[in-house]
Swiss-Prot record:
Residues 50-422 are annotated as: Disordered. CDD domains: IF2_eIF5B, IF2_mtIF2_II, mtIF2_IVc. Residues 57-71, 275-291, 306-389 have a biased composition (Gly residues). It comes from the Bacteria. HAMAP family: IF_2_B. This is Translation initiation factor IF-2. Residues 548-552 are annotated as: G2. SUPFAM superfamilies: Initiation factor IF2/eIF5b, domain 3, P-loop containing nucleoside triphosphate hydrolases, Translation proteins.
Length: 1021
C-alpha cells in the first residue's frame, strides 16, 4: 500500500479485527489512538513479525474447523481451502496439510501411527498408542480430505483437561502426559541434537473472531475423559475453542500469501549427510505432526502430572510437532504444547510458540522443523506471560511511574531521634534559631521543629528567631542547660574570631604613658553644670543651647595650671534633664572622676541622686562642686548634710570626699575646683595608658552632618588613633578621613583620653558604642554586618514572642485601640535616644498607644515623608529641618511635621495629642419626669400619654424610660411626639401638662412615670 498503513488496513490484511491489532501494538509498546491511525513502516514490520505468516484469510464461508451441530457418527468433511493451517505450509505446488482440527491426522506411513488429532474420534485401544511420524520427509502427504472412520463417539470431545496427582499411572489407551512418546519398536527416542527442532519463533495461530476468551462459559455438554474409549459422534467445541483463521503475529519474512500452501521444511529434500528419520538429521519427534505451537503465554501453568490437554491438530507428515494432546492446555484454548523428549510436561502438543521448556503442566517449547534454534516468543497472550526469548523493551506501568513520582515528592521524615543532653550546658546567642540549636547538639533541625510543635505547642520554623524562653524550655525538654549569651560576651566572641580584643589588661612589654584624667560633670538640671564648664573653658556654651539646658554630651579638653604645672584635663558635660538618663550613665562609665554639681540654694534633687548612683555604680571617685554660693538663700552646709545621707562625707566632717564651693557666674574658686580634681586623680587613679597600640575607645556622641556625613565624637581610651585607620564602632564602620578637636581644628592623631570628632563612618554610630581600629576595611565590614544580624535576630525574637492565647487576645485588643505613629529625627543620636525613651514612657490609658516606627539622625528627607504617608505617622524633628523638596512633598501628601528644639516641649505636645485621641466618656444626665394621668388612643399613632411634668424638662427626641411601680418596664425609648394641647412643643417644663407619644410602644398605663435623660460627655483627666 502507498504511504503509511492504517490500523484497519493492517487488520484486513492480517485477517483479524482492528481491536486485536490495537492490542498487539500496545503489547509491543506502540500506543496508537484508533483504528484510523497510521503506523510507521518499522512498526508495521514489527507487527507482522509478531503475527503468524497468514497475511490474508481464506475466502468467506463458515470455518471448516467448526463441527456442525448434531450427534452424527462422524463430522462433516472439511471444505478445501477453509481448514486452518496450524503448521507451516508446504512449498506451493505440493499438496500441503489440510486436516482440520475436527478430523483425524492422516497416517504418513504404516510404520508410523500418528496420535489422535483434536476433535477426532479415538481409535481402539491397540490403535490408540502413539505412532511415530514417517521416517522420510520425502513421502507424499495424503489428501487433505482423507478422514479415517470414527470408532467411538465417546472420545469425540477429546481428553478433558484437569489436574491429576503427579506420578500416578496413566490411563490405559493413551499416552501419559509429560512422558516421552516411545518410537515404534519400543526403543526410546533419541535426544535432540544441536540440529534438532528448537522453539518456534512465533506464537501460534489465533482465531480471527472472538472465541478464545478463557473465562467464557462453555455452552457444549461435558466432555468425556481422555481415558474413555469407544465410537461416537464428535461433540461440538465450546465457544472458547480455537477456530480456524489467521492468528496474531504478522507473516514471517518471505512467507507466501494467503490461498496457497506454505512451504514446510519437512517437505524439502533432506540435506546431505543428515540422519534418516527427520529433517535436519534428527529423528522425528513422536506425537504426530502439527503446525506451529501455541504461545506458552496463552496457557496457565499446570502441574507436571496434570491431565493431558486437548489433542493437537493434524499436520503434515514428517514434521515434528504435537499429534497427541499437550499437557496443561486450558479448556477452550488452543491445542496443547508439544512435549520435548525427556522434558516434563504434557504430551506432544499440536505445535505452539516457544513456551518455556520444562514449565510444569505444559509441553516443551515448539521447535522449527529444520535445524537451528528459533526465537522465543515474547508476546504475552491471554493465558500468561510470554515465553523465553529475546527481551523486549520494558515499559513502566502508570502505577510504577506514579509511585516513583510520589516518592520524589515525599517530604523528608522528621521523626529522627533527638539526642538527650543529660544536663549538658550549651551556649546560644540571643535570637538563636532551631538550626543553631541543632548545630550545637548535632541533631536534625526538622526534628527540633517537631519537638517544639508537639511538646511546646509552638509553630516555629527551623530558621526563625526564637525567644530566650522558648530556647530554655526546649533545653529543659531535651535535658540541656541552655545558657543565653549576653551581648557583651557575644561581642567578645565575635572579636576573638577575628583575633581581636577590646580592653583587657596591659601586657608587661607594653610601654605606658601618662594620660589626662577624664572628668564628667553631672547634676540636676539648671544647677549650673554647663555654666561651670564655660567658666573653666572661658566660653559661653549655655547661650547656644536651646532653652538654656544641655541636650548633648559635650567633650572638651582644657589645660589647668596646678602648682605651676600645666595639666590637661578632659571634661565631659552630660545633660541633667531626667530624659537623658542613658547619657548620664554612659558619662559615668567612661570617666575617671565625677564632679557632682549641686546648687547651694536648691539642695539635693532627684537627678542629683541619680547621678550619684551612676557614679557609685561605676566605682569612680566623686568631687562635689557646690555652685551658686553667691545667691541669696544659699546654704552650702545644708548640701553637705544632705549628701552625707547618701554616703558622701566631706573632709571637714571626717570623710574622704572633697567639697568645693564655687560660683560659675562670677568664676569664683574655679582654680580650687581644678586643684581638687588633680589631687583626687593623683591620689586615687593610675593615669597611664599605652600609646603605641591600635586605638580603642568609646563613641560619646554621633550626628549626621549635611556636608560631612556621619560624624562621631569619640574618646580614645588606649592607643593612638590616626587618619587613615580602619575603624568599626557598633554597627558602623569606615576609614578615618579627618579628625577635628573641640575647637574645629584638624588633628592627625589622637592619644589616650583625647576627645575628637571622626569623619568617615558609613553610618552614624550610636552613643556609647565601643570603637576599635582593625587591620583592614574588610574585617571592619564583616564585624559590623555580624553585629547588625545579631541585633536584628534579637529584635525579631522580641517582636514575635510566644504565640499564646493571651498574646493573641492582646493583639486583638491592640488592633481595636487607637495608635499614634511617630517618626523621630534628631541632630545627634543621644538626643534621639533620649526623646524616644521619654515618649515611650507616656501613659494616658489603654485605649491609645504610641508607636515609633522609625528614628534617625539628620535632616528630614523625602523618604521619611513617604514612610509617614504610608503609615499615617507624624514626623518629629528635633533640632533638624527638612531637606530638599521634603517640605513640598509633605504638604502634597498631607503629612504633619512638628519641629522642636527643647525636649520637654515635644514630650508635652505628644502627651496632649494622645489624650485628645482618647474616646470620649459619656454619662447619663436626667432631664425630667412626667406622671401619666390619662391614656388616649389616637388612630395611626397609637397610645398617647396625657402627662403632668413633675420635675425638670421633657424634650422631644430625647431618650426615655417607662417606670411602673418603681420598676423599669421599658428602657431606651424615644419621645417621638410632644404636644401642648393641640400644638406641637419642643419642650415642656415642670408643672405643665402635655401629651407624650413613645412611638410604637403602647403599653402605657395610668400612674406610670416617664423619665427622660441624655448622654453627656465627661472630660478626661
Amino acid at each position: 500500500m502507498a504511504g503509511k498503513a492504517r490500523v484497519h488496513e493492517l487488520a484486513k490484511e492480517l485477517g483479524v479485527d482492528s481491536k486485536t491489532v490495537l492490542a498487539k501494538l500496545k503489547d509491543l509498546g506502540e500506543f496508537v489512538k484508533s483504528a484510523s491511525s497510521t503506523v510507521e513502516a518499522p512498526v508495521v514490520r514489527k507487527l507482522k513479525e509478531a503475527f503468524p505468516a497468514e497475511g490474508g484469510s481464506a475466502s468467506g464461508g463458515r470455518p471448516g474447523g467448526r463441527p456442525g451441530p448434531g450427534n452424527g457418527a462422524r463430522p462433516a468433511p472439511p471444505r478445501p481451502g477453509l481448514a486452518p493451517r496450524p503448521g507451516p505450509r508446504p512449498v506451493p505446488g505440493r499438496p500441503g496439510p489440510a486436516a482440520r482440527p475436527g478430523g483425524p491426522a492422516a497416517p504418513s506411513a504404516p510404520a508410523a501411527p500418528s496420535a489422535p488429532a483434536p476433535g477426532a474420534p479415538a481409535a481402539s485401544p491397540p490403535a490408540s498408542q502413539p505412532r511415530p511420524i514417517a521416517a522420510s520427509a520425502a513421502a507424499p502427504p495424503p489428501a487433505a480430505t482423507s478422514i479415517p472412520p470414527v470408532s467411538s463417539p465417546a472420545a469425540a470431545s477429546g481428553p478433558r483437561p484437569g489436574p491429576r496427582p503427579a506420578g500416578g499411572p496413566a490411563a490405559p489407551g493413551r499416552a501419559r502426559p509429560g512422558a516421552p512418546v516411545p518410537p515404534p519398536g519400543g526403543s526410546a527416542p533419541s535426544a535432540p541434537s544441536a540440529g534438532g527442532p528448537r522453539p518456534g519463533p512465533r506464537p501460534g495461530p489465533r482465531p480471527s473472531a472472538p472465541g478464545n476468551n478463557p473465562y467464557t462459559t462453555p455452552s457444549a455438554g461435558p466432555r468425556q475423559s481422555a481415558g474413555q474409549s469407544g465410537s461416537g459422534p464428535a461433540s461440538p467445541p465450546r465457544p472458547g475453542a480455537p477456530r480456524p483463521g489467521p492468528r496474531p503475529g504478522g507473516p514471517r519474512p518471505g512467507a507466501p500469501g494467503a490461498g496457497g500452501p506454505r512451504p514446510s521444511p519437512g517437505s524439502m529434500p533432506p540435506r546431505p549427510g543428515s540422519r534418516p528419520g527427520g529433517s535436519g538429521g534428527m529423528p522425528p519427534r513422536p506425537g504426530g505432526s502439527g503446525g506451529p505451537r501455541p504461545n506458552a503465554n496463552m496457557f496457565q501453568p499446570r502441574p507436571a502430572g496434570g491431565a493431558p490437554g486437548r489433542p493437537g491438530g493434524g499436520g503434515a507428515p514428517g514434521r515434528p510437532g504435537g499429534g497427541g494432546g499437550g499437557g496443561g492446555a486450558r479448556p477452550g484454548g488452543f491445542a496443547g504444547r508439544g512435549g520435548a523428549p525427556g522434558r516434563p510436561g504434557g504430551g506432544g502438543g499440536g505445535g505452539g510458540g516457544a513456551g518455556a521448556p520444562g514449565r510444569p503442566g505444559g509441553g516443551g517449547g515448539g521447535r522449527p522443523a529444520a535445524g537451528g534454534r528459533g526465537r522465543g516468543g515474547t508476546t504475552a497472550g491471554a493465558f500468561g506471560p510470554g515465553g523465553r526469548g529475546r527481551p523486549g523493551r520494558q515499559r513502566k506501568s502508570k502505577r510504577a511511574k506514579r509511585q516513583e513520582w510520589e516518592s520524589g515528592l515525599e517530604a523528608p521524615r522528621m521523626g529522627a531521634m533527638v539526642p538527650r543532653g543529660n544536663g549538658q550546658a550549651i551556649r546560644l546567642p540571643r535570637g538563636a534559631s532551631l538550626a543553631d540549636f541543632a548545630d550545637k547538639i548535632d541533631a536534625n533541625p526538622g526534628a527540633l521543629v517537631q519537638v517544639v510543635f508537639t511538646q511546646l505547642g509552638e509553630m516555629v520554623t527551623a530558621t526563625q528567631s526564637c525567644t530566650d524562653e522558648t530556647l530554655q524550655l526546649l533545653g529543659v525538654t531535651l535535658g540541656y542547660e541552655v545558657q543565653i549569651v549576653s551581648p557583651e560576651d557575644e561581642d567578645k566572641e565575635l572579636l576573638e574570631s577575628f583575633d581581636l580584643s577590646f580592653g583587657g589588661e596591659y601586657g608587661d612589654d607594653v610601654e605606658l604613658s601618662i594620660r589626662p584624667p577624664v572628668v564628667t560633670v553631672m547634676g540636676h538640671v539648671d544647677h549650673g553644670k554647663t555654666k561651670l564648664l564655660d567658666a573653666i573653658r572661658f566660653t559661653d556654651v549655655v547661650a547656644g543651647e536651646a532653652g538654656g539646658i544641655t541636650q548633648h554630651i559635650g567633650a572638651y579638653q582644657v589645660r589647668a595650671t596646678v602648682d605651676g604645672d600645666e595639666r590637661p584635663i578632659t571634661f565631659i558635660d552630660t545633660p541633667g534633664h531626667e530624659t537623658f538618663t542613658a547619657m548620664r550613665a554612659r558619662g559615668a562609665q567612661v570617666t575617671d572622676i565625677v564632679v557632682l554639681v549641686v546648687a547651694a540654694d536648691d539642695g539635693v534633687k532627684p537627678q542629683t541622686i541619680e547621678a550619684l548612683n551612676h557614679a557609685q555604680a561605676a566605682g569612680v571617685p566623686v568631687v562635689v562642686a557646690v555652685n551658686k554660693v553667691d545667691k541669696e538663700g544659699a546654704d552650702p552646709a545644708k548640701v553637705r548634710g544632705q549628701l552625707t545621707e547618701y554616703g558622701l562625707v566631706a573632709e571637714e566632717y571626717g570623710g574622704d570626699t572633697m567639697f568645693v564651693d564655687v560660683s560659675a557666674r562670677n568664676k569664683t574658686n574655679i582654680d580650687g575646683l581644678l586643684e581638687a580634681i588633680i589631687l583626687t586623680a593623683d591620689a586615687s587613679l593610675d593615669l597611664r595608658a599605652p600609646t603605641g597600640t591600635e586605638a580603642q575607645g568609646v563613641a560619646i556622641e554621633g550626628r549626621l552632618d549635611r556636608g560631612r556625613g556621619p560624624v562621631a565624637t569619640v574618646l580614645v581610651q588606649r592607643g593612638t588613633l590616626r587618619v587613615g585607620d580602619s575603624v568599626v564602632a557598633g554597627e558602623a564602620f569606615g576609614r578615618v578621613r579627618a579628625m577635628l578637636d573641640e575647637h574645629g581644628g584638624q588633628v592627625t592623631e589622637a592619644g589616650p583620653a583625647r576627645p575628637v570628632q571622626v569623619l568617615g563612618f558609613t553610618s552614624v554610630p550610636d552613643a556609647g558604642d565601643n570603637f576599635l581600629v582593625v587591620p583592614e576595611d574588610r574585617v571592619a565590614r564583616q564585624i559590623a554586618e555580624r553585629r547588625q544580624a545579631r541585633e536584628r535576630n534579637a529584635e525579631l525574637a522580641l517582636s514575635r514572642g510566644r504565640p499564646t492565647l493571651e498574646t493573641i487576645l492582646e493583639r486583638m485588643k491592640e488592633g481595636e485601640k487607637t495608635q499614634l505613629n511617630l517618626i523621630l529625627k534628631g541632630d545627634v543620636s543621644g538626643s534621639v535616644e533620649a526623646l524616644e525613651d521619654a515618649l515611650l514612657k507616656i501613659d494616658v490609658g489603654d485605649e491609645v498607644g504610641l508607636r515609633i516606627i522609625d528614628r534617625g539622625v539628620g535632616a528630614i528627607t523625602e523618604t521619611n515623608v513617604m514612610l509617614a504617608s504610608a503609615s499615617d505617622a507624624v514626623i518629629i524633628g528635633f533640632n533638624v529641618r527638612p531637606q530638599g523638596k521634603a517640605t513640598e512633598l509633605a504638604d502634597r501628601e498631607g503629612v504633619e511635621v512638628r519641629y522642636y528644639s527643647v525636649i520637654y516641649q515635644a514630650i508635652e505636645d505628644i502627651e496632649n495629642a494622645l489624650k485628645g485621641m482618647l474616646k470620649p466618656v459619656y454619662e447619663e444626665a436626667q432631664l425630667g419626669t412626667a406622671e401619666v394621668r390619662e391614656v388616649f388612643r389616637v388612630p395611626r399613632i397609637g397610645n398617647v400619654a396625657g402627662s403632668l411634668v413633675r420635675s425638670g424638662i421633657i424634650r422631644r427626641n430625647t431618650k426615655a424610660r417607662l417606670i411602673r411601680d418603681g420598676v423599669v418596664v421599658a428602657d431606651n425609648l424615644t419621645v417621638e411626639s410632644l404636644k401642648r394641647f393641640k400644638d406641637d412643643a419642643t419642650e415642656v417644663r415642670e408643672g405643665y401638662e402635655c401629651g407624650i407619644g413613645l412611638g410604637s410602644f403602647n403599653d402605657i398605663k395610668i400612674d406610670d412615670v416617664i423619665e427622660t435623660f441624655e448622654q453627656r460627655e465627661v472630660p478626661r483627666v
